[in-house]
């Protein structure tokens, strides 16, 4: 069944799968098709109520900011054209139900190339609508997913002891490297890459640039309360999806009043009032969805690889 419709099981905060297929691939495909139609229609119409009703967790935070930018500056909410989907459907009997889709996504409303994207959908309870909880652009191929005899995948719990790290601390370990770089102890288990040491380098460069202006720059990648999902891989590891916040501050030392600190352009529409000026500080916070490969504990010299990321600005403030 590993064709254009592929079965899989979740590793969110819900328990591991018990082998019952309460959600079929046909159900997932119908929910996915409905989402594509409704989300693009809401974006085209600028219908914030309808658009946000289709999202949750990291996706809601990013989408809320996009609709805020539409209202404040007329910036169109992104619309996309999607390629052929591959479905990963959980084998859980109860709720929450969820599934993942791997596909290509090309912007319609702005220039941009197609990106290979993984999307996580969830229905929290019977009678509740399906929501898109997060999207992440892949920077390498997805790992092979282990499946049962019916083609459905094996769920991975948040505390699985058979992995290099329990899935619920993968995000915190990534954050250690992003916040402090390769000298952080987490670098022993987190591989270098654009979403780990690369993000640290980018933030460090921003800090150096701000220091040259006489400002003090701080950043912190931290965990979120968002649902976490995971799939067993064929080598005994796991593919883990999770959400994170990246909070940044640029301030005059001691928060004394000084010359205005510029607000990043992508955050200007998110200010509560256009009169906000960074005489003291500017806060620019992001919300991200990540996907990582967590190798089996038995793998020698293995490290966790963060293979996908996506998100955007979610909060801005200046005073």
Give a label for each model feature:
Residues 254-282:
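Mixed-charge, low-complexity intrinsically disordered segments
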Residues 56, 126, 245:
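Residue-level marker of positions within ordered structural domains that often coincide
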Residues 19-70, 144-214:
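Core segments of small alpha/beta cavity-forming domains
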Residues 69-115, 215-261:
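Surface-exposed, charged secondary-structure patches
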Residues 76-78, 157, 264-269:
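Glycine-rich loops and low-complexity Gly/Arg-rich segments
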Residues 1-103, 111, 115:
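An N-terminus-focused feature that recognizes amino-terminal "leader" regions
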Residues 108-164, 233-241, 266, 276-319:
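Short beta-strand edge/turn micro-motifs at domain boundaries
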